[in-house]
A protein has these predicted regions:
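Glycine-rich loop/linker segments at domain edges
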Residues: 2-8, 12, 125-146, 198-242, ...
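Conserved beta-alpha junction segments in alpha/beta enzyme cores
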Residues: 57-100, 104, 237, 351-404, ...
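Thiamine diphosphate
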Residues: 98-103, 398, 417, 421-447, ...
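N-terminal amphipathic, basic-rich helices that act as targeting or association modules
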Residues: 39, 154-159, 163-311, 627-628, ...
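N-terminal secretory signal peptides and thylakoid transit peptides that target proteins
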Residues: 22-42
């Protein structure tokens, strides 16, 4: 996903570019007609975001200064029954945002939590990130950036309900209170939110509201079962892949075996003969390549049709990337001068009493979400509707409009629940969305008017590109007998994720992509010279859960542990000394993990060892103390104790789940077979049989502990991943005496 960003870091021209697809076409119903329509579908407060500004203006104009993102009418529906539906402006793909954001709004609304439901937003202008001004689910920003927004939305809706009750009873609004979805008035009078919602919607939206004192929170901070838990655990939850429209067809694409290859011959006679196949279409695919789409009545005939195709490809004009050759090239690059991010004096390196040299290799990694990529497109005259689990509906809407020859406002995106993403559903090229649009356009040109769902198989997904980049690190470190680092000369070689994309303007500085170096040096006060090279092999790359920290945290935390071992220091005490007094959150997280794990006090079984790592990413700090062993040459992780500092916690259960999920994904990086490799341009892996992800038998016991804080929330979707692998590696190194300098682990 996107690395951590601060408000204002996205330049205005990028905001304008991404915002072009926001559907802000007003549906100008008269207010009376709108009220009638809202009532007819059982909704009262906030049914249609396009109408929020127009309705507020017709009610007196008091909210004219408010942005669409500040209008409760776009985010809150209250049915006559009192059921509250909160529209979530982020993609839910397992991180729990469809519970966390409604909790925030419901807190200030003073709603009855048992009556709260949630739904996704769209590419409407109301649902952009309130700080960045674009549609965005990434960078662990969801709760962090929308915390104040959703509090104010809830407070505004509550104020409108109070005003409606005051008008009905003809009393001073100051005499009223709310509790769990009910307005309480003088003399024991009560009105439910459902009874007041229609009247409240007709009132001006207050610009200024008073928010609760955090000591009065009754929902925020409470361990809460996720809204979607029952639907998911019972198999009732619909995802993008489950989209079913009347007359819908399914398309499966034969992609080039080498990225960017083009077709020379197509024999589709056998495919067309398969029952259920409706069309075979040549379509453009990512990186200038060509593919063949088989459109059929369902997935199985489409898949059979694709398997029956006889295709020949021209791979001569495109580079055929090869993992072994790339590693050799990376090693050559590492020895050359390059761009500098840090440039400390390296003179002390020559005279340092102790020295350490190391090389680290990190492979390409596939995102491999449980739900493969899919997108359903329905075209009509001058309009398009898309159903897709999109991390950036604005970006995807712009790309879809361009592919279809439409204006951005003619494209409507229905954001669907997604079964994981980890950054894959946020490609700057919108590759699979553009592909689905190209197929729908070609099918319509061939006389087919049915909606078409384009569906990737697991093999398509793993071989389809957009990987975590392969990286090579080299370090030369000089330190003294007390472990004080005197000079640290470091080189990183790896592809840039953002160069040449719309994100490059604010991510690439002095030729260095910040996503490749985030997590280096900080928070440790190290005299470092950091040199960076960005080669450009023909392999599409993308952010992968926790982005650069997937490799930088491993390098930093294992090398520091190695220095501690070399100077016979406890790794916890060594880190605490490096933190000094400047990093209280790091100290608190690490100390909490140490205290809860029994580190240094509890006797471990024979053949077991402790491992420690701590890392900050996306403004949150996670420290791990792990217990590991080696059995028959195979590393085993037994227990993980986490200390987490993410400031104020909205839902402790979500934080715990995110830490566990991220840690398991970090564990996957360590396991044999968890690498994407290429041979003569072809990806060698295809499914979970040859691309390893952690199974339940690999998963350790978890104890997750959170440092109490009242400061505004920080991100938690990704920070649990980076420190897991180095903590595991440090434990194994203490057992074997040998550092592990590549992922996945290789002990021999």
């Amino acid at each position: 996903m996107l690395p951590s960003l601060e408000h204002g870091e996205i330049p205005r021209n990028l905001q304008r570019l991404l915002a072009r697809s926001q559907s802000d076409e007003p549906a100008m119903l008269p207010r009376r007609s709108f009220l009638k329509l809202a009532g007819s579908v059982g909704l009262a407060l906030g049914a249609f975001p396009h109408l929020a500004m127009a309705q507020a203006a017709s009610a007196g104009g008091a909210a004219s200064a408010l942005k669409p993102t500040q209008q409760p009418l776009a985010f809150v529906q209250i049915a006559p029954s009192g059921e509250v539906t909160v529209t979530v402006n982020r993609l839910e793909f397992g991180q729990g945002v469809q519970t966390a954001l409604p909790m925030i709004l419901a807190e200030e609304l003073d709603a009855d939590w048992s009556q709260v439901r949630s739904r996704h937003g769209s590419n409407d202008a109301a649902y952009v990130d309130p700080l960045f001004g674009i549609h965005l689910t990434g960078g662990s920003h969801s709760v962090k950036n929308s915390f104040t927004q959703y509090r104010e939305l809830g407070a505004r809706a509550r104020a409108m309900l109070l005003s409606a009750a005051a008008a009905r009873w003809n009393v001073d609004v100051a005499t009223l209170r709310t509790r769990a979805g009910v307005v309480l008035g003088p003399g024991g009078r009560t009105l439910s939110y459902g009874e007041l919602a229609e009247a409240a919607m007709a009132l001006p939206v207050p610009e200024k509201v008073t928010l609760k004192d955090p000591k009065d929170f009754r929902i925020i901070g409470t361990p809460t079962t996720r809204i979607d838990a029952h639907a998911k655990s019972s198999g009732r939850q619909d995802f993008g892949i489950d989209t079913r429209l009347p007359g819908q067809l399914t398309a499966v694409v034969a992609h080039p075996p080498v990225f960017g290859a083009r077709l020379t011959t197509v024999d589709d006679s056998a495919a067309r003969a398969i029952k259920g196949v409706k069309a075979v279409l040549r379509v453009p695919v990512d990186r200038g390549g060509e593919g063949v789409a088989v459109v059929a009545e369902g997935y199985w005939p489409a898949r059979q049709g694709r398997d029956a195709l006889k295709l020949q490809w021209n791979t001569t004009p495109v580079e055929k990337a090869d993992s072994e050759r790339l590693l050799a090239q990376y090693r050559e690059l590492a020895a050359r001068p390059g761009r500098r991010q840090f440039d400390a004096d390296m003179a002390p390196l020559a005279t340092a009493p102790r020295k350490l040299e190391a090389e680290f290799v990190f492979p390409y990694l596939a995102h491999a979400p449980m739900e493969p990529l899919n997108c359903t497109v329905q075209l009509s005259d001058g309009r398009a509707e898309l159903w897709v689990g999109s991390q950036c509906p604005g970006l995807d809407g712009t790309a879809a409009a361009r592919a279809l020859g439409l204006k951005p406002e003619q494209v409507k995106i229905h954001v669907q629940m997604a079964g994981g993403g980890f950054g894959r559903r946020f490609a700057s090229t919108s590759d699979y969305v553009v592909e689905a649009c190209a197929i729908a356009k070609a099918a319509r040109a061939a006389g087919m008017k049915a909606p078409i769902r384009t569906l990737w198989s697991r093999e398509d997904d793993i071989r389809g590109g957009y990987y975590r980049p392969m990286h090579l690190h080299r370090a030369r470190i000089g330190f003294d007998q007390q472990g004080k680092v005197l000079a640290w000369d470091h080189v990183i070689v790896g592809q840039s994720i953002t160069s040449g994309t719309v994100f490059g303007e604010f991510q690439v500085k002095n030729g260095i992509d910040a996503t490749a170096t985030e997590g280096m040096r900080d928070p440790y006060p190290l005299p470092m010279r950091l040199t960076v090279h960005h080669p450009t092999p023909n392999v599409p790359v993308l952010w992968w859960r926790s982005v650069g920290s997937t490799h930088t945290a491993y390098v930093m935390e294992t090398l520091l542990d190695e220095i501690a071992r070399a100077t016979r220091q406890d790794p916890v005490a060594y880190r605490m000394r490096l933190f000094g007094d400047k990093h209280p959150r790091h100290r608190a997280a690490l100390q909490l993990a140490v205290d809860k794990s029994g580190y240094g006090k509890k006797k471990l079984p024979a053949g077991h060892a402790w491992g420690v790592a701590v890392h900050e990413s996306f403004d949150s700090v996670v420290a791990y103390v792990v217990e590991a062993s080696v059995k028959e040459g195979r590393p085993q992780l037994h227990r993980v104790t986490a200390g987490v500092h993410c400031n104020l916690v909205v839902n402790p259960r979500t934080v715990e789940a995110q830490v566990q999920g991220a840690a398991v994904m970090g564990l996957s990086m360590c396991l044999a077979g968890s690498a994407i490799t290429l041979k003569d341009g072809v990806v060698e892996q295809s499914n979970f049989g040859d691309f390893t992800v952690a199974r339940i038998t690999d998963t350790p016991a978890f104890d997750v502990h959170i440092v109490p804080s009242a400061d505004p929330p920080t991100g938690m979707g990704e920070p649990g991943l980076p420190p897991l692998a180095p903590a595991f590696a440090n434990a194994i190194a203490r057992l074997t005496g040998k550092p592990l300098r590549q992922l996945p682990f290789k002990l021999t």
